[in-house]
Amino acid sequence: MKKEETPADKLLKKAESKIGCSYEYGATGPDKFDCSGFVQWCHDQIGVTVPRTSGEQYDQGASATGAKGDLVFFKKNNKINHVGICDGDGNMINAQCSGVKKVAISSVKPNWGMGDNCGYKTFL
C-alpha cells in the first residue's frame, strides 16, 4: 500500500522544484525569490497561507522542532533576517541572498553570514 503524501512532503516537493532559481530581494516567484517570498510561494502552492516577511512568519508561526517542512529562522543584529524550509535531515531549502544567490540546499547551521539560528516555526 502506498503511503499518503503528508503536507510536509508536498511542501518539500514544491521547494525542491525551485532549486536553482535566482535570488532577488523582494521577489515572490515563480522564477525569482527572496527568502521569505520563497517560503510564502511554496506554502501557497499547497494551499497554506503564510505572511510575506520572515519577521511576520516568525511571529505568526507555531513553535516547531526542525522536522521536515518546518521553517528555520536566523537572526542578525537582533532582527530576523533569513528563513528556510527544513528537509528533516539537518538541511534547509532556501533562497540564499549571498554566496550562490539562488534557491539551494544548505545546512541549518549558520553559515555565509546569515546570523544565528533562532528557532523553528510551522504553518502546517
Q: Language model features by range: what are they?
A:
Residues 2-9, 29-33:
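Soluble non-cytosolic domains of exported or imported proteins
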Residues 17-68, 115-118:
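Catalytic cysteine-centered active-site loop
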Residues 1-2, 51:
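Short, intrinsically disordered low-complexity segments
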Residues 6, 13, 52-64, 80-124:
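Aromatic- and glycine-rich peptidoglycan recognition patches
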Residues 25-26, 74, 95:
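Thr-Gly-centered strand-to-loop micro-motif
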Residues 8, 12, 36-39:
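A general structural signal for well-ordered alpha-helical packing
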